Each structure stands twice: as structure tokens, then as C-alpha cells.
């Protein structure tokens, strides 16, 4: 969990130039005086991680408590919260160890610290991959519930949802382990970038299609009640704003991290790219912010879940 300059060691393999990628012959520190580096204090990392940790623990506990929330949809939401919880937990653990090592309050051999760092890297990477997968799974689940409403309960059954969840976790752990082991291969980084783009396109296509169907439905209702066109336009505008916020937050929080991976492959030692690499901590902080925002978008909008959350907070088990 060593820190190189201002860069934390978490997923530190991403901060170094992969040896398998051709070099461009430029020094990595040739970023120029114009380069802007956003410093993220360890205290801020710790605070963001703790907020996300508590928030997602509450989501998992709430869904576990109420049997009415044990449907496939809430299973996916629970697993998303668990993934975000692991991302935050890994961040909190690493930041705490870094602070203890720097303060001299924790003494450990370099080999032990390296092994601990590798474990945290695998946990964090696998939880990030699973988080993206569950965001996609939630989009697919909602799409089926709208376009195949009559067959939804026969298509999305609890056993199928559990098998899908198990497959996502196994694949996430497997691929994250391979990624950490072979991070110095450009193909591995490109696979991660392609995976992110695939999830982004999947979510965009499904949610845009759902918005179009909702607008058609609202237009049909307006015609039945002989209402004017502005009602439909207002509904469509509201839906478009909601969709923009949902996809915008996803892209803004995850996009910079995968841009970082892309630039490692395309221009590992170009001054402009090197400047972007210096903000790796900021990109990680944005992902943790996404872990804080996810429950607000996918979980706490449910009235049943909010009611159960109040019971959890008042310890009325």
C-alpha cells in the first residue's frame, strides 16, 4: 500500500506504465507547468468511504429484514449495494492502513503490506466490475418488467436471478484476479474499457426505449381524457431529465477512470496523458461518490424500502 508521490497504492498497478505497451520516448514527468493536479486528502477519502459504507450497509440490512423486498429486482439492488459496500470498505481499509503506516503506529514487513495491498486490489476491482454488472442487470430487469409485463414473473424468477447473481460474482472475482495479475498487457486494459462502454450502451439503449414507451403510454392516456399535447410534452421532458441525470451520473463517475485506462494504452508517456494520470486519486473518489449516489437512485426511492429503513434505524427488529 505504498504511496508514490500523491498517488495512493489502491489499484496502483494502474498508475504505472505497462511494460508491454510500446513507449513513446517521453519522460513520464514531462507534464508542463500548465498541468493541473487535484489533490484528494486521505481524510476526504476516508470520509467518503465511511459515508458510502454506512449507507450501503443500511440498504443491505433493510432488504434482508423485509421479506417483501426479497424479489429479483431488490436482490439486484441489494447486490449493487454490496458491491458498492466492498468498494468503500476497501477504500476505508487502505486509507486507514496508509495513515497508520505514515504515522508509525503500524509496523509491518514490506512483503505483508504488499500481500495486503494485492488482496485489497482484487476485492476493489472485483466489486467495481460487479457494480457495473448489477447496474446493467437492474436496467434489464426494469426493461423486462415494462415490455413483458404479463410474462415478467415467469421470465425473471428468483432462482434465475440467484443464478445470474452467482455468475456475476464469480466472473467478477475471476476477471479481477486476471486483471491484477496481467495489468501490464494492453489487451487486458482494453477489455475493461470495452466492458464499460458495453454497459453504458446497454443502459442507454434500454432506458431510452423505456422512456419512449412511457411517453407513448402517457400520450394514449391523454387522448382518452381528451387532454392537450402539453401534458404529454411535460411528461416527456420530466422523463428525459430523469434519464439524463441517471446516465449522466453514471458516465461522470465512471468515465474518467476508464479514460485513464484508455490513455495508458494510447499515450502512456505523452505529457498531456501524464497530466491526466496525476489525477488518478480524483477518479477513484468519483467512483466512491457513485457508490454514495447509487442508493439514492435505485433503493431509497422505494416507499416500502424507506418504511423498513425507518424500522432498522429505530432498531425495531
UniProtKB/Swiss-Prot annotation:
Tell me which UniProt keywords the record has, alphabetically.
Cell membrane, G-protein coupled receptor, Glycoprotein, Lipoprotein, Membrane, Palmitate, Receptor, Transducer, Transmembrane, Transmembrane helix
Q: SUPFAM superfamilies of this UniProt entry? A: Family A G protein-coupled receptor-like
Q: Which residues are sugar-modified?
A: 29
List the molecular function annotations (GO) for this entry: melanocyte-stimulating hormone receptor activity
- Membrane topology type: Multi-pass membrane protein
Q: Where in the cell is it found?
A: Cell membrane
Lipid-conjugated positions (S-palmitoyl cysteine): 315
Q: Which sequence ranges are listed under topological domain Cytoplasmic?
A: 64-72, 141-163, 212-240, 301-317
Q: What would be one Gene Ontology cellular-component term for the protein? A: plasma membrane
Any one Gene Ontology biological process term? adenylate cyclase-activating G protein-coupled receptor signaling pathway
Disulfide-bond pairs as recorded: none
- Which Pfam families would you find in this protein's record? 7tm_1
Q: How does it assemble?
A: Interacts with MGRN1, but does not undergo MGRN1-mediated ubiquitination; this interaction competes with GNAS-binding and thus inhibits agonist-induced cAMP production. Interacts with OPN3; the interaction results in a decrease in MC1R-mediated cAMP signaling and ultimately a decrease in melanin production in melanocytes.
Q: Note the PANTHER family from the entry.
A: G-PROTEIN COUPLED RECEPTOR
The protein's name in its UniProt record: Melanocyte-stimulating hormone receptor
Native species: Pongo pygmaeus (Bornean orangutan)
Q: Which gene encodes it?
A: MC1R
Amino acid at each position: 500500500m505504498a504511496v508514490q508521490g500523491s498517488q495512493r497504492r489502491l489499484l496502483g498497478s494502474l498508475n504505472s506504465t505497462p511494460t508491454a505497451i510500446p513507449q513513446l520516448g517521453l519522460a513520464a514527468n514531462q507534464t508542463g507547468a500548465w498541468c493541473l493536479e487535484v489533490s484528494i486528502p486521505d481524510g476526504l477519502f476516508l470520509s467518503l468511504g465511511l459515508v458510502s459504507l454506512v449507507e450501503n450497509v443500511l440498504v443491505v440490512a433493510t432488504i434482508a429484514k423485509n421479506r417483501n423486498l426479497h424479489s429479483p429486482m431488490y436482490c439486484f439492488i441489494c447486490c449493487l449495494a454490496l458491491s458498492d459496500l466492498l468498494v468503500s470498505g476497501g477504500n476505508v481499509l487502505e486509507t486507514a492502513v496508509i495513515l497508520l503506516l505514515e504515522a508509525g503506529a503500524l509496523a509491518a514487513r514490506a512483503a505483508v503490506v504488499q500481500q495486503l495491498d494485492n488482496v485489497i486490489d482484487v476485492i476493489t476491482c472485483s466489486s467495481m466490475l460487479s457494480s457495473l454488472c448489477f447496474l446493467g442487470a437492474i436496467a434489464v430487469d426494469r426493461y423486462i418488467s415494462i415490455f413483458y409485463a404479463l410474462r415478467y414473473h415467469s421470465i425473471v424468477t428468483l432462482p434465475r436471478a440467484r443464478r445470474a447473481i452467482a455468475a456475476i460474482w464469480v466472473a467478477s472475482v475471476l476477471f479481477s484476479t486476471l486483471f491484477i495479475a496481467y495489468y501490464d498487457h494492453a489487451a487486458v486494459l482494453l477489455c475493461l474499457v470495452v466492458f464499460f462502454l458495453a454497459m453504458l450502451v446497454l443502459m442507454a439503449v434500454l432506458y431510452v426505449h423505456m422512456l419512449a414507451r412511457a411517453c407513448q403510454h402517457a400520450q394514449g392516456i391523454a387522448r382518452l381524457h381528451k387532454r392537450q399535447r402539453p401534458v404529454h410534452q411535460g411528461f416527456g421532458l420530466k422523463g428525459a431529465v430523469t434519464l439524463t441525470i441517471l446516465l449522466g451520473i453514471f458516465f461522470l463517475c465512471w468515465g474518467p477512470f476508464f479514460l485513464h485506462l484508455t490513455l495508458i494504452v494510447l499515450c502512456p508517456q505523452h505529457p498531456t496523458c501524464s497530466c491526466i494520470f496525476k489525477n488518478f486519486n480524483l477518479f477513484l473518489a468519483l467512483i466512491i461518490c457513485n457508490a454514495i449516489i447509487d442508493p439514492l437512485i435505485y433503493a431509497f426511492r422505494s416507499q416500502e424500502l424507506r418504511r423498513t429503513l425507518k424500522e432498522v434505524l429505530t432498531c425495531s427488529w
